[in-house]
Amino acid sequence: MMCFRLSPVSGSGLVLSCLLLGAVQSYAFELNLPDSKATCLFAKWKMNFTISYETTTNKTLKTVTISEPHNVTYNGSSCGDDQGVAKIAVQFGSTVSWNVTFTKEESHYVIGSIWLVYNTSDNTTFPGAIPKGSATVISSQSIEIPLDDIFRCNSLLTFKTGNVVQNYWDIHLQAFVQNGTVSKEEFVCEEDKSVTTVRPIIHTTVPPPTTTPTPLPPKVGNYSVSNGNATCLLATMGLQLNVTEEKVPFIFNINPSTTNFTGSCHPQTAQLRLNNSQIKYLDFIFAVKSESHFYLKEVNVSMYMANGSVFSVANNNLSFWDAPLGSSYMCNKEQVVSVSRTFQINTFNLKVQPFNVTKGKYATAQDCSADEDNFLVPIAVGAALAGVLALVLLAYFIGLKRHHTGYEQF
């Protein structure tokens, strides 16, 4: 017997042993697959798919999100065959099917390819779609998990292939379960190691003292852009993205090992673009001012949130990281780049040179502490002048008082 459970994300207490349908945006899937009356494959996860397709109306694009499963079946799910291959298979009626495979090795198991098949001939799901027919999207994975460990990834994992975006989160799964007991040992995905979500504080009648969790600092990454065979831009920095659009702030540390980078260099501007499974793009655009300095002029970002929505912000009127041309800008302490009211970037151990890179190495750095010194010098000078003026006035009034006293004695 196979038992499946679908429970609403909203936290409703209604749970059916095999299927629950309701008017919510996405569902948590749970599969407890037995073999000889003992669990051999366990999985609990959330997912949705966004598919863009061409329509007969002036060949415009429409988008459909598959997030409310109807007529769901799990035919074809298996604990493993003679070749050591297990599979989870999900069918959303006759329109969409999804499956993922697992391969058993000597000391670990591997999450393999994810297959998504959809049929645009279904006019209910894909009204006015052209052309009609079946389409297959394959997302190749190769995640190795130790045997007897359960894989956990609460972070949003996004895979974009062509016109299809797949979102997965709150994943807990174990293939090839030993002795029917799901493991308590977790193998945590890299994204969970670098994401911290600050929980809201729940106030009682007499609020107890609370502290806001401090997110871990991000890993420092090295990024570069080339123009032909020569490096034209260098950047070293740890990046922490802060989104405050929702009631619960979302804090995301960029992991350099899973982040791609590209860019371009021009005489007056330079661009560094970062992207990964969660960030569609994060652009840093530098510009030359007064033909003697460079600065960070623009930041553009578009990223997927935990609920599958897309958060986008752009600001082309910034003024950060100012330094003379021919030098680099450095700031080892934490800095905040406020891009908008709802988005900021915290940088750690920053060093950047977007122009005049020679032999692929940083030039002499302008330290951000110099900015503070430049700010403090006029304050110190002003304070000194104010002190001198106060002494002069004090001496004047003392002399004036003595002068009057002399007249009275005379």
UniProtKB/Swiss-Prot annotation:
The chain crosses the membrane at residues 376-399. Coiled coil: none annotated. Residues 401-404 are annotated as: Important for binding and subsequent lysosomal degradation of target proteins. The keyword Signal applies. Pfam families: Lamp2-like_luminal (PF01299), Lamp2_2nd (PF21222). GO terms for molecular function: ion channel inhibitor activity. It is a single-pass type I membrane protein. Extensively N-glycosylated. Contains a minor proportion of O-linked glycans. It comes from the Eukaryota. InterPro entries: Lamp2-like_luminal, Lamp2-like_TM, LAMP_CS, Lysosome-assoc_membr_glycop. Residues 29-192 are annotated as: First lumenal domain. Residues 29-375 are lumenal. Residues 229-375 are annotated as: Second lumenal domain. Residues 1-28 form the signal peptide. Lysosomal membrane glycoprotein which plays an important role in lysosome biogenesis, lysosomal pH regulation and autophagy. Acts as an important regulator of lysosomal lumen pH regulation by acting as a direct inhibitor of the proton channel TMEM175, facilitating lysosomal acidification for optimal hydrolase activity. Plays an important role in chaperone-mediated autophagy, a process that mediates lysosomal degradation of proteins in response to various stresses and as part of the normal turnover of proteins with a long biological half-live. This is Lysosome-associated membrane glycoprotein 2. The lineage of its organism: Eukaryota, Metazoa, Chordata, Craniata, Vertebrata.
